[in-house]
UniProtKB/Swiss-Prot annotation:
Residues 140-257 are annotated as: Required for interaction with RELA. One of its GO terms (cellular component) is nuclear matrix. PROSITE patterns: ZINC_FINGER_C2H2_1, ZINC_FINGER_C2H2_2. Residues 34-47 have a biased composition (Low complexity). Residues 57-72 have a biased composition (Polar residues). InterPro entries: Znf_C2H2_sf (IPR036236), Znf_C2H2_type (IPR013087). The gene is GFI1. Transcription repressor essential for hematopoiesis. Functions in a cell-context and development-specific manner. Binds to 5'-TAAATCAC[AT]GCA-3' in the promoter region of a large number of genes. Component of several complexes, including the EHMT2-GFI1-HDAC1, AJUBA-GFI1-HDAC1 and RCOR-GFI-KDM1A-HDAC complexes, that suppress, via histone deacetylase (HDAC) recruitment, a number of genes implicated in multilineage blood cell development. Regulates neutrophil differentiation, promotes proliferation of lymphoid cells, and is required for granulocyte development. This is Zinc finger protein Gfi-1. The keyword Hydrolase does not apply. Signal peptide: none annotated. GO terms for biological process: cellular response to lipopolysaccharide; DNA damage response; negative regulation of neuron projection development; negative regulation of vitamin D biosynthetic process; positive regulation of interleukin-6-mediated signaling pathway; regulation of toll-like receptor signaling pathway; regulation of transcription by RNA polymerase II. It comes from Canis lupus familiaris.
Length: 422
């Protein structure tokens, strides 16, 4: 291949190499900026100015040029022949000016006279991170989520006075500057911060124990499982939204009643259960069966049971039910399906509720207590039957002789022994 072709090819690809201005580049630039002479003096004002082509881009952002010597509307001494009305907004390119010098010819934003408000451009390298925070908008989808120490969701501003975070004492608020707090370590290291976790404890798998949370509203009937969350004594149910957000973030969790061992998926469900079942006040009683309730709405829902017809019949034994769910549970008896075994004796049950009632025999727990005589029972149905002794209510009556009974089993026995019916 001819050597001349190689030389031409090398010159054709010379744009890969960085260009450096020639020796007469600055001289030509000064001539363009100051046509009156090469020494930088202007023929109009006569003031001594520094050639603008030698200024760096950063200096143009932070330093405004001095235009006190020339009038804003004057185009005298410039390279353009346009009207002076648009002098401060646009300057046409010159054939003898390079692209680098063409940028320096354009006036800075401080020279734009028609704008009523002054514009101060920022040099981003000259500002600290704290000075730029007002330019960034924070995204806060949930106010309770940006306090998760183990998840790196802290927020710098303090919580509102009515926020659940204010329920924690000042000693925990001061501990938020530990390893899990912002500035005290990485986001992933919050779980190992110990006392530095201002609001939460260890969120790891090792914290899957039971943590009792005494409250004034529930009388110490709560227990939390799965996250090791701690709340101050007397905080009450105001931290329930906080616990719920944590449960959603960490992917699961359950809340167990320490009185009857019933498990709920949300703290609100546990609170309603404690208030209705273990608060000790059930002033609303059913006139048909004598069953008592803690709320009037629960009594109204229960009265619908007595008015409904038994439209769901079992095809095996002919027993009728008012709800399809009750019939489905009844069919487990005929299929002999017992999926719930007792952890103490191995006895199996059709329903989980029956298995829990059976475990009270082994543990000796009697969570249901009579408010009149103080007698305790392991099952709520036994407490309901016992309460009829104090009220004298007999909901089961014989249709042959009219005699009433407090229990259905007593009515069945009466029909068999006195009337010969089965």
């Amino acid at each position: 291949m001819p050597r001349s072709f190689l030389v031409k090819s090398k010159k054709a690809h010379s744009y890969h190499q960085p260009r450096s201005p020639g020796p007469d580049y600055s001289l030509r630039l000064e001539n363009v900026l100051a046509p009156g002479g090469a020494d930088g003096t202007s023929s109009a004002g006569g003031a001594q100015t520094e050639p603008r082509g030698r200024l760096s881009p950063e200096s143009q952002l932070t330093e405004a040029p001095d235009r006190s010597s020339a009038s804003p509307g004057s185009c005298e001494g410039s390279v353009c022949d346009r009207s002076s009305e648009f002098e401060d907004f646009w300057r046409p390119p010159s054939p003898s000016v390079s692209p680098a010098s063409e940028k320096s010819v354009c006036p800075s934003l401080d020279e734009a006279q028609p704008f009523p408000l002054p514009f101060k451009p920022y040099s981003w390298r000259g500002l600290a991170g704290s000075d730029l925070r007002h330019l960034v908008h924070s995204y806060r989808p949930c106010a309770a989520l940006d306090r998760g120490a183990g998840l790196g969701l802290f927020c710098e501003r303090a919580p509102e006075p009515g926020h659940p975070a204010a329920l924690y004492g000042p000693e925990r608020a001061a501990g938020g500057a530990g390893a899990g707090a912002p500035g005290g370590g990485s986001a992933g290291g919050g779980a190992a911060g110990g006392s530095g976790l201002g609001l939460y404890g260890d969120f790891g798998p090792a914290a899957a124990g039971l943590y009792e949370r005494p409250t004034a509203a529930a009388g110490g009937l709560y227990s939390e499982r799965g996250h090791g969350l701690h709340a101050d004594k007397g905080a009450g149910v105001k931290v329930e939204s906080e616990l719920l957000c944590t449960r959603l973030l960490l992917g699961g969790g359950s809340y167990k009643c320490i009185k009857c061992s019933k498990v709920f998926s949300t703290p609100h469900g546990l609170e309603v259960h404690v208030r209705r079942s273990h608060s000790g006040t059930r002033p609303f009683a059913c006139e048909m069966c004598g069953k008592t309730f803690g709320h009037a709405v629960s009594l109204e829902q229960h009265k619908a049971v007595h008015s409904q017809e038994r439209s769901f019949d079992c095809k095996i034994c002919g027993k009728s039910f008012k709800r399809s769910s009750t019939l489905s549970t009844h069919l487990l008896i005929h299929s002999d399906t017992r999926p719930y075994p007792c952890q103490y004796c191995g006895k199996r049950f059709h329903q989980k509720s029956d298995m829990k009632k059976h475990t009270f025999i082994h543990t000796g727990e009697k969570p249901h207590k009579c408010q009149v005589c103080g007698k305790a029972f392991s099952q709520s149905s036994n407490l309901i039957t016992h309460s009829r002794k104090h009220t004298g209510f007999k909901p089961f009556g014989c249709d042959l002789c009219g005699k009433g009974f407090q229990r259905k089993v007593d009515l069945r026995r009466h029909r068999e022994t006195q009337h010969g019916l089965k």
